[in-house]
Amino acid sequence: MTPEEQVKILKRNVVDLISEEELLDRIKRKGKLRVKLGVDPSRPDLHLGHAVVLRKLREFQDLGHTVVLIIGDFTARIGDPSGRNETRPMLTKEEVLENAKTYQEQAFKILDPKRTELRFNGEWLDRMTFADVIILASKYTVARMLERDDFAKRFKEGIPIAISEFLYPLAQAYDSVAIQSDVELGGTDQLFNLLVGRKIQEEYGQEPQIVMTMPIIEGTDGKLKMSKSYGNYIAFNDPPEEMYGKLMSIPDELIIKYMRLLTDIPEERIEEYERKMKEKTINPRDVKMVLAYEITRFFHGEENAKKAQEHFVKVFQKKEIPDEMPVVEISQEKNIVDLLVEIGAASSKSEAKRLVSQGGVYIDGERIEDIKFTVEPDGERVLRVGKRKFYRISGGETKKL
């Protein structure tokens, strides 16, 4: 494949590319590039938001390039100094290694292990002396740091910014120097840090890396970016039926965006779906089922995707309950709030109370609206929590206290 053809593929769905001319020239001159992605080992659970960048990395691999996956063990072990949010807990070296292993296992569902070089930035950052840090810090100015949106906002509002926070973009940039990256990828929120990498590489006599950013996708709520902390995420490790169901719950407005960024469906076909939905000649639900099937198939295989689709049609389109569901045995009466927590349907009593008060809990199809309801251990009932969680309760006559 010619360099021009490679660039045409690689720039697809990209937000920032600095610059296309440099990328083309670098491929022509070097052939195989070193493509960098830095990852945070304190959060090893990957979701579809991470898949956007990982899929672009896989495109580089399929074209013969090498992906350098940098695990930020140095950062994880010293903790996040930022005072803006809850401080990230410091991790031991053992915890970092375990999280890195979990991250790899999930990332390799998309990446090719044979074309992935795994590095820990503690390899070089642990060895830096204080003099080395001063030299690194001298290569960037406070004025330039304050061009970053979050720093500028906090400075304007008089919110403290620790000197150590300025060192984090520099540490990330030095990673690029250490592994001599040709390209660095990230979400659009990483643009500033990636550009710092270009500058620092130049300061150390290296050719500056090409910067490539990918869109940040909204979560299942269609409003906030996909994040575990927002509870709107779809995890790589979600069971097939849950993954399919979550995808079917996204707003119609996200269907095309998800298709472009998360599937290999040809662009011509995606454009056809987009046109037909605008013309109202196709039901968005049917297009969403194609999307849900394709993503579930990618992560769980053809057979599991088919079963997940059949389950969805049976339970949610025909309003039937599944044949198989977890069985919960109770030997004494249980308050509904306590029961939800015990079976794992809610993570806390406050969440359980919220589920009940918001009308998300049903027994035998009847909504429970009182947190004082109890379930008696005589008979069998079907408990539904939200749209997708079903439990068979052995016992089951409900009684209001």
UniProtKB/Swiss-Prot annotation:
It is an enzyme of class 6 (ligase). A motif ('KMSKS' region) lies at residues 225-229. It comes from the Bacteria. Keywords: Aminoacyl-tRNA synthetase, ATP-binding, Cytoplasm, Ligase, Nucleotide-binding, Protein biosynthesis, RNA-binding. One of its GO terms (molecular function) is tyrosine-tRNA ligase activity. It is found in: Cytoplasm. The keyword ATP-binding applies. Disulfide bonds: none annotated. Residues 334-395 form the S4 RNA-binding domain. Signal peptide: none annotated. Transmembrane segments: none annotated. Catalyzes the attachment of tyrosine to tRNA(Tyr) in a two-step reaction: tyrosine is first activated by ATP to form Tyr-AMP and then transferred to the acceptor end of tRNA(Tyr). This is Tyrosine--tRNA ligase. It comes from Thermotoga maritima (strain ATCC 43589 / DSM 3109 / JCM 10099 / NBRC 100826 / MSB8). The gene is tyrS.
